[in-house]
Amino acid sequence: MASLQFSSQFLGSNTKTHSSIISISRSYSPTPFTRFSRKKYESCSMSMNGCDGDFKTPLGTVETRTMTAVLSPAAATERLISAVSELKSQPPSFSSGVVRLQVPIDQQIGAIDWLQAQNEIQPRCFFSRRSDVGRPDLLLDLANENGNGNGNGTVSSDRNLVSVAGIGSAVFFRDLDPFSHDDWRSIRRFLSSTSPLIRAYGGMRFDPNGKIAVEWEPFGAFYFSVPQVEFNEFGGSSMLAATIAWDDELSWTLENAIEALQETMLQVSSVVMKLRNRSLGVSVLSKNHVPTKGAYFPAVEKALEMINQKSSPLNKVVLARNSRIITDTDIDPIAWLAQLQREGHDAYQFCLQPPGAPAFIGNTPERLFQRTQLGVCSEALAATRPRAASSARDMEIERDLLTSPKDDLEFSIVRENIREKLNGICDRVVVKPQKTVRKLARVQHLYSQLAGRLTKEDDEYKILAALHPTPAVCGLPAEEARLLIKEIESFDRGMYAGPIGFFGGEESEFAVGIRSALVEKGLGALIYAGTGIVAGSDPSSEWNELDLKISQFTKSIEYEATTSLQAIN
């Protein structure tokens, strides 16, 4: 990680009248004063790499232009095409900037349904927030303590945003080197609190220093993108938006950006059909685990041996498994994700697919952090039990989970580690509740929320650097656990268990990329899961837990054992 050096950036604001536009929000800055050069990451298929720009030089403008609301995606598409043409005829007089054109739609349409209609245009992304109904809102509690959230920035203006789908890339951020503070500043350069829906969606590798396997190469060490065309689903309404980003210093002019957007807009479909709950229409021909069951048991025993050594500081390590499935036909990753979404209202759903890359999809229950201006919230999630068909049996399992010494140890390690890390970057930390059970569709976990208040928004990078990786996906101490994982695991986790989410000018939110799969045409899918090994862990129980965690993926595909096909090594 780069050293934590922060610099302030002046952002002014201005508004001007624009025909057919009912509101404009903008931040703009003085003329660029320096040019910063760094090693380029080659990619000719996507706009410009924002990491190659001078993060010390503010953009000329960051603005959002909102058109009048319409009734349908078709009308919104027509309105956007017209607005892009108008922008081309009356261009902003800046050498760099970001302009978001957005059209509200007076009906709620699923963002994932819109994405499915776009005929696999790449790059593409999807991020769906989970439902937090029934859980305390610690960010809101902190806001109320400071006067009902007025002026302290702990309440989001987009709290009813349900999910986001995007295609194309107005600007992307990618490199083979680990994500650094400079990279974070490069992303923040394209964002503004006055345009809160301009966001960079993406993720980072679990181990940024590890060797990148071929299936993960297109993702680099990290990958983020501000979509060219974006569909926002809100509670009760929707929005179609287009974003243009340019920087003359990166040889990507406003004219280049508009032409690229117009090409993408020609491919946008306005015919949106709701994805129905139906079979994916594929059968599994073979399934192979890495490690195999025979190799996994000794790996757990080795981890336990280290944990039980008095001279070893290690008290937890998370060992993962990679399950490759080969299917008779290609799996549609968006249709697969839609099935997960129907079951996973209490989880984040995501899809991340750079151009020419497999689709990384997931249905993760775990939040890494959410920042709303100065408020930051994280959570501890650990220990696993299955759900039961009857409520009486389900309560028995819940009581067993709450009273298990082994599970309490695993959970306490996670919670106290996150509390310690937040204490290092926040002026105070609230934990509520200390321990409870969080029930998902197929499993239940021990759970707690933690929240605090940053001294300044620029501390956001510190949150990411401090919290990732959590003990829930790596272990404790983190470095000792990482080294053991590197020694034991024979596959590349890639972005599995890494931070997945978005950076925004007003708000950022990241989930932990667990319960996830990498889907590629002609190659089936790689499904990832992991379990925490602590003193008292049983290899057989941990293996069964891995099967339980991937069941949300495998349940939707009919498995047909075929003896004529060999397992893949």
UniProtKB/Swiss-Prot annotation:
Record: transit peptide: 1-45
Record's subcellular location: Plastid, Chloroplast
Coiled-coil residues: none
Chief location category: plastid
Essential cofactor(s): Mg(2+)
Tissue localization of expression: Leaves.
Enzyme class label: isomerase
Role: Isochorismate synthase involved in the synthesis of salicylic acid (SA) required for both local and systemic acquired resistance (LAR and SAR) while SA synthesized through the phenylalanine ammonium lyase (PAL) pathway seems to potentiate plant cell death. Also involved in phylloquinone (vitamin K1) synthesis. Has no isochorismate pyruvate lyase (IPL) activity.
Family stated for the protein in its record: Belongs to the isochorismate synthase family.
Name of the protein in its database record: Isochorismate synthase 1, chloroplastic
Organism encoding this protein: Arabidopsis thaliana
Gene that produces this protein: ICS1
